[in-house]
């Protein structure tokens, strides 16, 4: 088993290939469009909850080796931007920033309000980040992966920068991922 699979991102097969690679094991996936001179700024996108904690821990261990700083971002929906939700999200992000500091990664929290995909892409542009980190969606009850949703949309729009997809044990321990063709495919790129 591997912790991380790194591969060249391929726009023509982007989301479909990423799903196939994630189906092949319990690893995380780093999609890289081209050689990167350095990764100094990382945007870690999380939702409050246990899978988000896993995203922070894995990414923190990786990012400390890069010597990069991080921004920990959560996006609240417009109709969910209530004081209680904002306070809960703020506490979650503050705990994540403390965790990253313990790992030697300087970090800052950020909360945006709006459509998740649009707000993440806007933050990527404004912050000029070198790496985007997204949590792999939890497997749906029918066993299918959900990269065709928000994560898939972001993968399609962020093709110019590396994207790390972090898998939580909460998604790994559920039903296996099935591809868009309805079966588990084991791509040759992963099986050696």
Give the predicted meaning of each segment.
Residues 8, 110-111:
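Structural motif
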Residues 12, 49-50, 114:
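Short, surface-exposed acidic/glycine-rich loop or hinge patches that mediate macromolecular interfaces
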Residues 1-41, 123-192:
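Gly/Ser-rich helix-loop-strand patches that form or flank binding pockets
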Residues 24, 37, 41-110, 129, ...:
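Small/aliphatic-rich secondary-structure junction motif
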Residues 112-119:
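Charged docking surfaces used in two-component/phosphorelay signaling
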Residues 13-14, 55, 92, 116, ...:
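Residue-level preference for nonpolar/small residues embedded in alpha-helices
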């Amino acid at each position: 088993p591997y912790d991380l699979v790194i591969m060249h991102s391929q726009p023509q097969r982007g989301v479909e290939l990423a799903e196939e690679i994630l189906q092949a094991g319990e690893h995380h996936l780093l999609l890289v469009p081209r050689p990167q001179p350095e990764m100094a700024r990382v945007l870690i996108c999380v939702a409050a909850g246990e899978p988000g904690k896993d995203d922070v821990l894995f990414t923190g261990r990786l990012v400390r080796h890069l010597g990069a700083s991080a921004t920990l971002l959560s996006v609240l929906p417009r109709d969910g931007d209530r004081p209680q939700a904002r306070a809960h999200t703020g506490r979650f992000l503050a705990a994540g920033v403390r965790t990253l500091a313990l790992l030697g990664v300087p970090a800052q929290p950020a909360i945006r309000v709006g459509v998740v995909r649009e707000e993440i892409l806007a933050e990527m542009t404004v912050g000029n980040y070198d790496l985007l980190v997204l949590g792999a969606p939890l497997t749906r009850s029918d066993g299918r992966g959900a990269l065709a949703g928000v994560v898939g949309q972001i993968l399609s729009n962020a093709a110019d920068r590396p994207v790390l997809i972090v898998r939580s044990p909460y998604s790994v321990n559920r039903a296996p991922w099935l591809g868009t063709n309805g079966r588990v495919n084991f791509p040759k790129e992963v099986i050696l």
